[in-house]
């Protein structure tokens, strides 16, 4: 029952935002009693925290399912393709609510999950440098921070919504352009061929 509550609550938070989903609305949508929700969660913040971990764990599992046998530039592109596709349809109010009403919780969860995500991303960049897919003169941590910043701006704010881009075009016009700049000629050829095959 707890897992079902988490899964359904995650869907509701992502679609409607956090603030919009009061405990009463949650129990109404979930078809359970308030008593049931408090059996598993201390309060809405506790529920939200566990929902955030569920969300990030799911994303991390998707990343690990990608083949690391492919060219690192293509692998790195696929990572961000999944990220954009996943977050593209999330209501931007979800991120605004998290930042505005639950900033400490957002920082806490980010602090717990960030390290494993960043280590995974950095390992792909470093493998790309070793393979010759990425330029040797790039600083992996700076490159990663740039991609993370660009990604957040592209999918978690309204800045790019006005262009009416599909998830794929948003990726190609933002993050993919930056990834192409990290590439050597060999990496760029492989990446362009990979993108054309999609």
Question: Where are each of the predicted segments found?
Answer:
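Hydrophobic alpha-helical connector segments
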Residues: 50, 61-93, 144-147
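Short secondary-structure transition hinges
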Residues: 88-122, 129-134, 141-142
């Amino acid at each position: 029952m707890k897992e079902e509550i988490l899964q359904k609550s995650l869907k509701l938070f992502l679609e409607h935002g956090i603030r919009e989903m009061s405990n009463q609305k949650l129990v109404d949508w979930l078809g359970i009693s308030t008593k049931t929700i408090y059996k598993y969660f201390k309060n809405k913040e506790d529920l939200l925290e566990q929902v955030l971990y569920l969300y990030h764990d799911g994303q991390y599992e998707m990343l690990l399912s990608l083949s690391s046998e492919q060219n690192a530039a293509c692998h790195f592109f696929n990572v961000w393709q999944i990220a954009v596709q996943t977050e593209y349809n999330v209501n931007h109010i979800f991120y605004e609510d998290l930042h505005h009403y639950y900033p400490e919780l957002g920082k806490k969860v980010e602090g717990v999950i960030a390290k494993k995500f960043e280590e995974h991303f950095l390992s792909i960049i470093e493998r790309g440098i070793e393979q010759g897919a990425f330029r040797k003169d790039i600083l992996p941590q700076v490159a990663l921070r740039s991609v993370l910043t660009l990604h957040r701006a592209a999918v978690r704010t309204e800045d790019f919504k006005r262009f009416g881009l599909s998830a794929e075009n948003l990726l190609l016009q933002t993050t993919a352009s930056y990834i192409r700049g990290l590439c050597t000629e060999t990496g760029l050829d492989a990446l362009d061929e990979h993108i054309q095959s999609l």
